[in-house]
């Protein structure tokens, strides 16, 4: 029995490394070059890293380091100074995990406080570590001029944060999600998915300013299907928007790279926050209403027992 525990941990570490590397390759397909540095508007491995830490605990951290190493090898030849990037990409999700555990975060994301904790303690704050160490590593190695620090740093930080906000909730809820039994709900879910894809594709490829049309659909997904419906829709919106931005198509045409990145990350951030926080709020309100109904039923039973019998 003793050998099974280390073997199981080793398999999880290797699985995390493979997942990190695979999603890293997907993210690099949508990369942009900021001041000569390769960055991606949506770095999916950070979402993988935090979700795996919440599932398996901090023991799988070597998988994060190995996955980062493999991702760096994909871009360029590995150098010892790249250990700074590996350290930052490993420490950032570990710090996110520690802070979330500290505040009593629940992976079910069924409370508004859990959604807010994931946004600030899981994404915005800890990803400062990976972006700062990574950008300074490029500066110290001479691969990036000091004057270009802030543009690269901001793009790095935004990409890592979006990976947490868009992918981590999806992974956490899909692990326990179940298909609805009602055929009408299944049909509604299919209609929602098709509509989100069609509207987002149109909005991101049209020269007209139609990006606002995605938000009523995200509200629909959050209200009707909670996070299991809202999270995939937000990720789909983000991927289609990033594809259009890298192609400089639709509303992203004719703009500088800085303008494109600002507009893109504003859209991605707003979509992620709308889906995550609204779904968490609706779920919390449903749970409160259900508990109130249960208390009322229990109270009615007590009153019925204490009431004097009728003559």
What are these regions (language model features)?
Residues 146-150:
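Juxtamembrane helix-entry segments on the extracytoplasmic side of multipass membrane proteins
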Residues 151, 155-167:
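Alpha-helical transmembrane segments that form the membrane-embedded catalytic/substrate-binding core
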Residues 303-311:
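Cytosolic, intrinsically disordered low-complexity tails and loops
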